[in-house]
């Protein structure tokens, strides 16, 4: 409730062609906290599998992040917008789906530092907070991080369908990734 903007990353906003005058509008915090949906948005939590603590886990998924949607810029770039700390999803398992301010700030700063060092990573658009208190060892202020990347598809996105033997979904996902991120492979004999 009552979302407000904690910080905006001007460099990331520029990638989306967001004018700095937009940051001061109340709607900015409402849209990028998930309180209001962006036009055409249909938020989802992504399913994936992978390894944790040395063991394969057949189903993980975004336990506290939702994909708000995708922005296509005037120069043809695609950016997926993901809100971390958004609350429970169908993949939350035992957690509450929330994030606290300290970990949100840490991820914001570390991600941008990695980018500055030339290491490919998600970019941080903004931190949004509200009145919610999140319980960890002690009560802490809650916050959400709006992350952006050309895609949030990961290796585990493919693994989950491979190990479930859902080859038609695996092919659909591969075709999507090829079409939008490796278009030079479309129609290639060795596209996969």
Question: Could you say what each language-model-derived stretch is?
Answer:
Residues 104, 134-192:
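ATP-dependent phospho-/nucleotidyl transfer catalytic cores
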Residues 1-105, 109-157:
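Broad phosphate/nucleotide-binding scaffolds in NTP-utilizing and phosphate-metabolizing enzymes
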